């Protein structure tokens, strides 16, 4: 069985653990059943969730059994934020989001194939509404609440911060009871003895450990453990997982596969070594080789390309990744634009300077106007100079006539035009 702790330490993933020697021994004696919770606070997971989802997968590949727990019940409340009360979403919305998260999480782990005998390391995908939905108010207060100290709960950093500001509802104040009880139920039902989560979850996770000790006195499945992962920050000080257009989602309807690929491909050279260790399943030797290439030949972006391809394939599938790569090549003159998947081309053009216009192709203005309206050049006179100097392209064909207009035959898939200034500046026109 692979020493998963050594691997996680090398990758810089471990923030805190309970007694490391005890945890290492339990893992060596394994397989250990572990879990991570994912609350449906939105209709999709985003790239920030990948750290936990992929860490679960690393444990599975090391010979352990992961449980991905979707918070169908805890999502009705939401883990308290440091600055403000969460908006409560309707039960119908939560149910829809739970379904979305289950579908997304299923792509990271290996489950028992239908009709097959389960293996000890086959993953489980559970919903805490299964037990929390049956919990009564009296049961919560009598059987769970009596094990919690108000003094300790008030000392929690999030609670203190909120009480110093706008305050906190009892609903959010009691969230820790529910998350802690999740650990108890998974311990009882599945012999789960390890919970993982982000470093901000340390207090909630250790509260679950205490509750197991209090409710399961003799600990029939052995002692429970906790492990949190490090907070991921970017070298430029901005928040990981955010772009100018917002969060980078795993749902292709919210973030296109093309935009997802470009997010990783555009990673800062200072960040890519850490990203490789946290998000890639490549071996230590492969990662160190890519890190060296970044140092020696940064312009090649070999590490960024490798990670973008690996994660796009993992999240969106091999075919979508191929579509994205072909689109990236074709946009910059190294492929045939007409052969691209229309959805991929449309998504790609929305990630570059573009303009969306209504009407027919006959109603479109001259090309110099289109170049200016996309922002590829600052003005129509600049567009004319670019054409005269041989630096303007329509669908990768050089434009030589400053009076040129677009024809029906120029439209890709009946609605797209790809404009380019020089080798690297790409823009687009999308007909509605």
UniProtKB/Swiss-Prot annotation:
One of its GO terms (cellular component) is cytosol. GO terms for biological process: tyrosyl-tRNA aminoacylation. L-tyrosine binds at residues 35, 175, 179. It is found in: Cytoplasm. The keyword GTP-binding does not apply. It comes from Thermobifida fusca (strain YX). The keyword Cytoplasm applies. Homodimer. Catalyzes the attachment of tyrosine to tRNA(Tyr) in a two-step reaction: tyrosine is first activated by ATP to form Tyr-AMP and then transferred to the acceptor end of tRNA(Tyr). A motif ('KMSKS' region) lies at residues 239-243. ATP binds at residue 242. Its EC number is 6.1.1.1. Keywords: Aminoacyl-tRNA synthetase, ATP-binding, Cytoplasm, Ligase, Nucleotide-binding, Protein biosynthesis, RNA-binding. One of its GO terms (molecular function) is RNA binding. Its main location: cytoplasm. PROSITE patterns: AA_TRNA_LIGASE_I, S4. It comes from the Bacteria. Pfam families: SYY_C-terminal, tRNA-synt_1b. This is Tyrosine--tRNA ligase. Signal peptide: none annotated. A motif ('HIGH' region) lies at residues 40-49. Residues 365-422 form the S4 RNA-binding domain. Belongs to the class-I aminoacyl-tRNA synthetase family. TyrS type 1 subfamily.
């Amino acid at each position: 069985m692979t020493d998963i702790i050594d691997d996680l330490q090398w990758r810089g993933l471990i923030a805190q653990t309970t007694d490391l020697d005890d945890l290492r021994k339990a893992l060596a004696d394994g397989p250990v059943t572990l879990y991570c919770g994912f609350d449906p606070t939105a209709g999709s997971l985003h790239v920030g969730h990948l750290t936990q989802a992929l860490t679960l997968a690393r444990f599975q590949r090391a010979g352990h059994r992961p449980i991905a727990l979707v918070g169908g019940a805890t999502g009705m409340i939401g883990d308290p934020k440091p600055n403000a009360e969460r908006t409560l979403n309707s039960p119908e919305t939560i149910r829809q989001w739970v379904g979305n998260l289950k579908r997304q999480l299923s792509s990271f782990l290996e489950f028992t194939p239908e009709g097959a005998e389960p293996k000890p390391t086959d993953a489980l995908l559970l919903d805490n509404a299964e037990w929390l939905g049956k919990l009564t108010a009296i049961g919560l207060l009598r059987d769970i609440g009596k094990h919690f100290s108000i003094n300790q709960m008030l000392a929690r950093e999030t609670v203190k911060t909120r009480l110093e500001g706008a305050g906190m509802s009892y609903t959010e104040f009691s969230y820790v009871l529910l998350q802690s009880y999740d650990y108890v139920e998974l311990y009882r039902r599945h012999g789960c003895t390890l919970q993982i989560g982000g470093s901000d979850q340390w207090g909630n996770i250790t509260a679950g450990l205490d509750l197991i000790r209090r409710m399961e006195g003799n600990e029939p499945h052995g002692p429970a453990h906790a492990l949190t992962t490090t907070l991921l920050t970017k070298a430029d000080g901005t928040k990981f997982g955010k772009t100018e257009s917002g969060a980078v989602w795993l749902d292709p309807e919210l973030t296109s596969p093309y935009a997802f690929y470009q997010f990783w491909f555009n990673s800062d050279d200072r960040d890519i070594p850490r990203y490789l260790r946290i998000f890639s399943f490549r071996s230590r030797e492969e990662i160190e080789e890519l890190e060296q290439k970044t140092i020696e030949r940064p312009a090649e972006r070999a590490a960024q390309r490798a990670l973008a391809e690996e994660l796009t394939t993992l999240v969106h599938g091999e075919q979508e990744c191929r579509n994205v790569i072909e689109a990236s090549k074709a946009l910059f003159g190294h492929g045939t634009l007409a052969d691209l998947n229309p959805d991929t081309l449309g998504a790609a053009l929305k990630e570059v300077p573009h303009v969306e216009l209504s009407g027919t192709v006959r109603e479109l203005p001259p090309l110099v106007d289109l170049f200016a309206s996309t922002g590829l050049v600052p003005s129509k006179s600049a567009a004319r100079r670019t054409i005269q100097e041989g630096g303007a392209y329509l669908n990768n064909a050089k434009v030589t006539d400053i009076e040129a207009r677009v024809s029906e035959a120029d439209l890709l898939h009946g609605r797209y035009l790809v404009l380019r200034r020089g080798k690297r500046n790409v823009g687009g026109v999308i007909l509605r």
